Structures are given as structure tokens and as C-alpha cells.
Amino acid sequence: MSNFTAEDKAAITSLWGKVNVEDAGGETLGRLLVVYPWTQRFFDSFGSLSSPSAIMGNPKVKAHGVKVLTSLGEAIKNLDDLKGTFGSLSELHCDKLHVDPENFRLPGNVLVTVLAILHGKEFTPEVQASWQKMVAGVASALASRYH
């Protein structure tokens, strides 16, 4: 059962078709690591995260940001089954990476900020509401396999 209306789905997919995954992914993960510095502990293997400029210029941050948004693209194709889409990622983050599920909401909120910056007037309050619903659904799906 989906909580997404036809209008939500249209708003999400329409904007997603205009998103440059490379630009938005790097910006989103970079901002996450700057704004919420405690999240850096999950990315020890990324090299220097010593300053905002080091983080924003770090190629591993950009590459992982692309990976995250590519996964999000899969979610957008499967809005009616977010838990199924993210089942294996939920298990990975729980069992192997030991990420506190409270952290799952942070990247989505940062992404919404990045989309607002990159898409300006096109990112209307209605579009934002649909995206907030979607990133909340993704965070919930990522936390679904925790025990």
C-alpha cells in the first residue's frame, strides 16, 4: 500500500528527470558530512574530511553521493514498494555497518535542501511536500530490517 498520491508521484518523477545525479549526489553527501560532522565516522576510508573544502572536494565523497542518489533513483521507480527496494540495504546498514537508523533521515533532508538550491522556483512547496514524504519513506524503509 502506497502513501503516495498520483500528484506526489508526478512531482517526484518530474523533478527527478531533471536532477544531475553527479552534481546533486556529491553536494548532498558533502553537505551531510559538513552539517552533521558526527556522520563522518561512517566514512573513515574516504581520506581527508578535515574541513568543509576537503569534504566538498573529496572524490570519494562525490562518488558515494552518486551511489546514494542512484539507489534513490531505484526507489523512485518503486515508490509503492520502498521496503522491498531497500531491504538488502537495510540489512547491510544494520548488520555490517551498524548505522543508527536515526541517521537515515538526515541525508534525505539534506537532499531536499540541495534540490531547492539547484531547482529554485521549480521546487515549489507542493513539490517539496512530495519529496519530504518520499525521503521519509526511504528512511523508514532503510530502518525496516533493524532488530
UniProtKB/Swiss-Prot annotation:
The entry's keywords: Heme, Iron, Metal-binding, Oxygen transport, Transport
Database matches in InterPro entries: Globin, Globin-like_sf, Globin/Proto, Hemoglobin_b, Hemoglobin_oxygen_transport
Pfam family, one: Globin
One Gene Ontology MF term: heme binding
Tissue-level expression: Red blood cells.
Binding residue positions for heme b: H64, H93
Task of the protein: Gamma chains make up the fetal hemoglobin F, in combination with alpha chains.
Protein family: Belongs to the globin family.
Name of the protein in question: Hemoglobin subunit gamma
Organism annotation: Alouatta seniculus
Gene name per UniProt: HBG
